[in-house]
Amino acid sequence: IPTRFWLDVLAKVCGICLGLGYDGALQYDPKDVERVRHIVRKYPSALLWTHKTYIDGFVVPKILFDNNFPMPHFFGGANLNVPILGFLLRRAGGIFIRRSFQDNEIYKLSLKQYIGYLMEKRFPMTWSFEGTRSRLGKLMPPKYGLLKYVLEGAHHAGSQDIHIIPVSVSYDLIRDAEEYAREQSGTPK
């Protein structure tokens, strides 16, 4: 369970990271934020955001934190569980999952049970619906695996009122596009 201290640290890190590549000013509709607040406080909820660049994962938590939301548990790939970052994210509600675990029934069952527990307790959840970033500013095809587990978890937990909230993160400029072009021309990552 996230603690206030680690959520404060994560919010500070999100603000710093957003300021590295962009001016740090996030624009959003306060009316939409209030509508989402009402839903998240009343119903089990999942906020699914678009993923076009590295910093997308910082945008949603920063807006939620700045607007005094109950902070969501967020799903990310196991590749994010690196020293320091993994330590921080876990303590702020991060849940690292493998990219593929089709043959591991115990892993599937454990994940479904944990998601069911989060929904039963009405902890909001968030993740990138595309599963990975596009790096070009375009949307990738959605990955339905985690959403399927959320729906199954809701069913097993008896949660019939789950709300899926789409969140679009847009930019005037995608800085990852230049890096991606270099990688495609043969420059190593």
Regions found by a protein language model. Give the residues of each.
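Catalytic core of membrane glycerolipid acyltransferases/transacylases, capturing the structured
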Residues: W6, R41-Y107, A154-I165
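Arginine residue identity/basic-tract feature
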Residues: R4, R35-R37, R41, R90-R91, ...
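Membrane-anchoring hydrophobic helices of lipid-metabolizing enzymes
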Residues: I1-A46, H51-K62, G86-G93, K112-Q113, ...
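Membrane-associated lipid acylation/remodeling enzymes share a hydrophobic transmembrane-juxtamembrane segment
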Residues: F69-G76, Q113-K189
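Flexible loop/turn segments at secondary-structure boundaries
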Residues: R35, T53-G57, L80-I84, D103-E105, ...
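Phosphate/oxyanion-binding active-site loops and adjacent basic polyanion-contact surfaces
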Residues: Y22-G24, D56, D103-L111, K138-K143
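Short, surface-exposed, charged/polar-biased interaction segments
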Residues: G15, K31-E34, N68, N81, ...
